[in-house]
């Protein structure tokens, strides 16, 4: 596959098949970007690309060859949104599942590294590049039974913040967005499709929705080139920290 003519600024969004990624792709398309929607689920991103006038690129961020192929298909990149990620399991360290930990590390940390490294030359060449990495408040806090996810998100955040210094003087801005509770497929994936456990995460609160985070990404992308928003934390009003909520109904 080769990329189409790209007269507009190009935004690459990973994890674009659902949730924050899909909403971000739609938001950036409305702002005039040609969006390259990247994810593993081909049918979803192909439908999305048709609807927004973008390009669908089927790729797994944990696969070196797939990421290299992604980079080869793009002649220009102005914005990269590192959104692919997720959690698996909720267990104490003593009962940690190493396969879950490996998956979280590969997807959240090495996936971000692969894509960023592959597209960085094009972002620099754009003359006004932007890298947005969607981490989590789990990149800033810890909570019981969540060490696998918080460790991966801390590492992802450290990667992004380190790059901020390494690119000082280059024409690339970097913004980390750390959401709290967002009602997407996140909890369903974490609990291996257990609808009841996933629903309980949001019980008694009004969580964020994907569009709330996407609007923040759009705001960041619309700032003048001299303005760098280093870190944005976005939580529901009902949430004070990763483990502290005000739940209606007494839960």
Residue ranges and their predicted role:
Residues 17-18:
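Conserved glycine-rich cofactor-binding loop
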Residues 121, 165-166:
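Alpha-helical segment proximal to the catalytic Tyr-Lys
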């Amino acid at each position: 596959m080769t990329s189409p003519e790209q007269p507009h600024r190009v935004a690459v969004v990973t994890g674009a098949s659902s949730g924050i990624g899909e909403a971000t792709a739609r938001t950036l398309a409305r702002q005039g970007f040609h969006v390259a929607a990247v994810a593993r689920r081909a049918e979803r991103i192909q439908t999305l690309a048709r609807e927004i006038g973008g390009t669908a690129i089927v790729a797994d961020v944990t696969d070196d060859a797939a990421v290299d192929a992604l980079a080869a298909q793009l002649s220009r990149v102005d914005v990269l949104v590192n959104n692919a990620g997720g959690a698996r399991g909720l267990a104490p360290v003593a009962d940690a599942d190493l396969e879950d930990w490996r998956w979280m590390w590969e997807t959240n940390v090495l996936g971000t590294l692969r894509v960023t490294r592959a597209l960085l030359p094009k972002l620099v060449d754009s003359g006004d590049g932007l890298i947005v990495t969607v981490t989590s408040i789990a990149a800033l806090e810890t909570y019981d039974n969540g060490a696998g996810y918080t460790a991966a998100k801390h590492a992802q955040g450290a990667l992004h913040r380190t790059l901020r210094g390494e690119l000082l003087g280059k024409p690339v801005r970097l913004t980390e967005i750390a959401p709290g509770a967002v009602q997407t497929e996140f909890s369903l994936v974490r609990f291996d499709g257990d609808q009841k456990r996933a629903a309980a995460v949001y019980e008694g609160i009004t969580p964020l929705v994907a569009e709330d985070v996407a609007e923040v990404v759009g705001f960041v992308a619309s700032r003048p080139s001299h303005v760098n928003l280093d870190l944005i934390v976005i939580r529901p009003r009902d949430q004070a920290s990763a483990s502290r909520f005000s739940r209606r109904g007494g839960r």
